[in-house]
């Protein structure tokens, strides 16, 4: 159906009256406009002739009242209702022009088509065809009218057409819905549109706007000036039409109503294209179209037109002509403001050209220069990536080599094969320990054997490795030595034989062992001598290096040669004891790695196997004797360590080497064949679980009363008597225990000496097998102070051991619950148990 449906004549006055029907024509002028002649499939209406001004003035039926220059003008009636607008010929044409610009003219055409269909004769055969045409044109497809109609209304019309039940009111519901939509949206926008404002400003009397397309030729000329190029001169040709008195004024309502049109026309006339798909002029880059936030634009309008106490005059009871009962509250005003903000939405602002220059990065350059710069940057990036990749590959290769060497060292040490690399004595990460770890190992060793003295070989460093490690360590020492049992002069510093063999781990351990285990005040001369010796070790004169590790000895040869001095200790350190140990004329046994008087060269430690047998025999004897005499060793051996502590270093070393490791004289060095043979398999490592059980058993026996005491000589002779008949690959304990026999009495003596000022507190916590031990500077301790020492807070029961004759064991555990009670002491210390309350 054609969209050229225009205003039709109103129904005959004799027809049924409808509230939404337009006003009847002026009496006497009914015949000036011919009636509508609908055609088949098309609702046509002849365009009415212009009504004269006299008829327009008298169309209210009352004539011109006396005393008035003119009645209400059509422009005033257009603002009253949509019917008044559509009832006027010029108003309907102007409204249609507005809807065409908004691309929703189908709503107006559908409204006029419904009016024309209502006037048709139902008996005419054309009526059914017109109804079908209206349904197909506006309702069946997905048009603007179809989107605004309710589904029930569309269903009702479709059913009526299918059943051919045609009625004059079948489109009334659809017309009412479309009319409501136009009244709420299009009609309100039309009253503030530029077309309507232009027509109002001209007074509706200028007929130039009706020629050559009528009102559609109106054009809004307000806005920014077009962009002017630097080499051009601006002329006023573009503003000729703006000089006419018909230009819309720059009022707030006018600007707000014409904002969208002005922005569109400015974009079309400017250099920048309105469509994003088209290229952008460089002059306007970065100055795209912006939309002012709805809140800022509307708040600005609201604040400028706000009816506040400052902006309203208070001359009489009415405020600016507004009755006080219609003012409303602040909440109502705010509600209206927010409703206006939601209705208006975003206000599009016109394009504002900027004259700033483009940034340097966006300045167009020559393709060749751009390509050269891009290539240089890409090559630089490629070099960086390649260098980083190669560095990562090298690091990965180093890690793989280290892992491979570590696995080879572990396999070679397990199979007993000789290791050619000098650093085989120092596996990766073997000595990287912090002081806290060494201190923890020291305390755990003290707690494991509090009542047993270990067979010692003199001064030693605290144990920090497992037994199997020390065993393999000794085996490697034997395997790396020459067959003749002699060392070249270059072996004076075994672990620092070459500068290339000085690793970070070795240096770290040397520093740690030297500081923490030999921290005795030294003179300036001793420090210089040690530095000179260290330089000689780092710069050897020969090319063949042999590794030799004296794991327990700190003595020096009687006549050292220049640059020929042993670097003792487990980790290859330079102990201070070497500088002031024994006297030059003192001869050391072969077991201690001393110098032979006849050969004048360092000898092999030939009694490593004998030492292992001593350790194994000591474990068997101590296990057998601890059942009956667990405390005899602890209380009897006090004189020897005190005496040895007061003796000068030379006498201490002499006594130790003359008596041997077990405390009695040694006549000859006993050698075992498997010790000297590097092809023999290593001994089986001890069971860790068995060692822990043995330590727990000894700790449990500490609390038993002392029953028997004997002399030092007989006790040591019973425990340390060697079993020479046993020779074979048997399991033995950690070799570091062999040196505890010499140091345990010394430690116990110092503990008893400090009891006058310090208090030893030992307790078992919640059934744990290993107890906790603390030293407190106090003469006595209460339960409250004891609770403060616990790191874990909670509800516990506290039991403390005290001497008692009630039982045969001679002691009981007494429960104490009062915080002010002084805790009992047992054998000079506090021994308690903390149990959790279930």
Swiss-Prot record:
GO terms for cellular component: beta-catenin destruction complex; centrosome; cytoplasm; nucleus; plasma membrane; protein-containing complex. The keyword Aminoacyl-tRNA synthetase does not apply. Residues 327-413 are annotated as: Interaction with GSK3B. Gene3D superfamilies: 1.10.196.10, 2.40.240.130, Regulator of G-protein Signalling 4, domain 2. SMART domains: DAX (SM00021), RGS (SM00315). The keyword Phosphoprotein applies. GO terms for molecular function: beta-catenin binding; enzyme binding; I-SMAD binding; molecular adaptor activity; protein kinase binding; ubiquitin protein ligase binding. ADP-ribosylated by tankyrase TNKS and TNKS2. Poly-ADP-ribosylated protein is recognized by RNF146, followed by ubiquitination and subsequent activation of the Wnt signaling pathway. Inhibitor of the Wnt signaling pathway. Down-regulates beta-catenin. Probably facilitate the phosphorylation of beta-catenin and APC by GSK3B. This is Axin-2. It comes from Rattus norvegicus.
């Amino acid at each position: 159906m054609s969209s050229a449906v225009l205003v039709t004549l109103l129904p005959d006055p004799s027809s049924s009256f409808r509230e939404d029907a337009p006003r009847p024509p002026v009496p006497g002028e009914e015949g000036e406009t011919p009636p509508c002649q609908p055609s088949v499939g098309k609702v046509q209406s002849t365009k009415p002739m212009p009504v004269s001004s006299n008829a327009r003035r008298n169309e209210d039926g009352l004539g011109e009242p006396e005393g008035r220059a003119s009645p209400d003008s059509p422009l005033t009636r257009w603002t009253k209702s949509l019917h008044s607008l559509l009832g006027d010929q010029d108003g309907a044409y102007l409204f249609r022009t507005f809807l065409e610009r908004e691309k929703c003219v189908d709503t107006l055409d559908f409204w006029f088509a419904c009016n024309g269909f209502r006037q048709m004769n139902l008996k005419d055969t054309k009526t059914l065809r017109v109804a079908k045409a209206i349904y197909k044109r506006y309702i069946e497809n997905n048009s603007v009218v179809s989107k605004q109609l309710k589904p029930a209304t569309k269903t009702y019309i479709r059913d009526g057409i299918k059943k051919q039940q045609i009625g004059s009111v079948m489109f009334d519901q659809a017309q009412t819905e479309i009319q409501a939509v136009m009244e709420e949206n299009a009609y309100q926008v039309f009253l503030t549109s530029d077309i309507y404002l232009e027509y109002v400003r001209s007074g509706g009397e200028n007929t130039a706007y009706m020629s050559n397309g009528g009102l559609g030729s109106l054009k809004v000329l307000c806005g920014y000036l077009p962009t002017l190029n630097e080499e051009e001169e601006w002329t006023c040709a573009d503003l000729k039409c703006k000089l006419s008195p018909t230009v819309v004024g720059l009022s707030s309502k006018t600007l707000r109503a014409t904002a969208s049109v002005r922005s569109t026309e400015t974009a079309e006339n400017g250099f920048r294209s309105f469509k994003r798909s088209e290229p952008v002029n460089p002059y306007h880059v970065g100055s795209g179209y912006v939309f002012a936030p709805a809140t800022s634009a509307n708040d600005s309008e609201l604040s400028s037109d706000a009816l506040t106490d400052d902006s309203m005059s208070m001359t009489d009871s009415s405020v600016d002509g507004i009755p006080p009962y219609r003012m409303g509250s602040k909440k109502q005003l705010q509600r209206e403001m927010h409703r206006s903000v939601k209705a208006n939405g975003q206000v599009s602002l016109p394009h504002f050209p900027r004259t700033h220059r483009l940034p340097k990065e966006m300045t167009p350059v020559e393709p060749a220069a751009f390509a050269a710069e891009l290539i240089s940057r890409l090559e630089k990036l490629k070099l960086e990536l390649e260098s980083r990749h190669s560095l990562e590959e090298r690091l990965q290769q180093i890690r793989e080599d280290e892992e491979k060497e570590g696995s080879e060292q572990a396999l070679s040490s397990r199979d007993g094969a000789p290791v050619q690399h000098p650093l085989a004595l120092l596996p990766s990460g073997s000595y990287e320990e912090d002081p806290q770890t060494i201190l923890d190992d020291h305390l755990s060793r003290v707690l494991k054997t509090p009542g047993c003295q270990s067979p010692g070989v003199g001064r030693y460093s605290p144990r920090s490795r497992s037994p199997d490690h020390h065993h393999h360590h000794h085996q490697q020492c034997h395997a790396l030595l020459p067959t003749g049992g002699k060392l070249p002069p270059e072996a004076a510093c075994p672990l620092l034989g070459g500068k290339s063999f000085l690793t970070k781990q070795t240096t770290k351990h040397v520093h740690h062992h030297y500081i923490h285990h030999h921290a005795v005040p030294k003179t300036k001369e001793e420090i210089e001598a040690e530095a000179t010796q260290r330089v000689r070790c780092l710069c050897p004169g020969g090319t063949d290096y042999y590794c030799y590790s004296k794991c327990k000895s700190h003595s020096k040869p009687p006549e050292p040669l220049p640059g020929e001095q042993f670097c003792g200790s487990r980790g290859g350190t330079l102990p201070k004891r070497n500088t002031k140990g024994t006297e030059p004329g003192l001869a050391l046994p072969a077991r201690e790695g001393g110098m032979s008087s006849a050969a004048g060269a360092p000898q092999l430690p030939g009694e490593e196997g004998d030492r292992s047998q001593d350790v194994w025999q000591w474990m068997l004897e101590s296990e057998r004797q601890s059942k009956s005499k667990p405390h005899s060793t602890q209380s009897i051996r006090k004189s020897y360590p005190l005496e040895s502590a007061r003796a000068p270093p030379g006498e201490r070393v002499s006594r130790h080497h003359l008596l041997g490791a077990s405390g009695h004289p040694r006549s000859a060095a006993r050698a075992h064949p498997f010790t000297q043979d590097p092809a023999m398999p290593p001994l089986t490592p001890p069971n860790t679980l068995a060692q822990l059980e043995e330590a727990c058993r000894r700790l449990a026996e500490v609390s038993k009363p002392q029953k028997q005491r004997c002399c030092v000589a007989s006790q040591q002779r019973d425990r340390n008597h060697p079993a020479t008949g046993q020779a074979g690959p048997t399991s033995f304990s950690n070799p570091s225990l062999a040196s505890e026999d010499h140091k345990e009495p010394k430690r116990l003596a110092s503990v008893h000496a400090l009891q006058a000022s310090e208090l030893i507190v030992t307790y078992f916590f919640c059934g744990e097998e290993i107890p906790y031990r603390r030293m407190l500077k106090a003469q006595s301790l209460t339960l409250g102070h004891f609770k403060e020492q616990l790191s874990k807070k909670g509800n516990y029961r506290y039991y403390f051991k005290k001497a008692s004759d009630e039982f045969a064991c001679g002691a009981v555990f007494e429960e104490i619950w009062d915080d002010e009670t002084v805790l009992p002491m047992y054998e000079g210390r506090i021994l308690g148990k903390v149990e959790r309350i279930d």
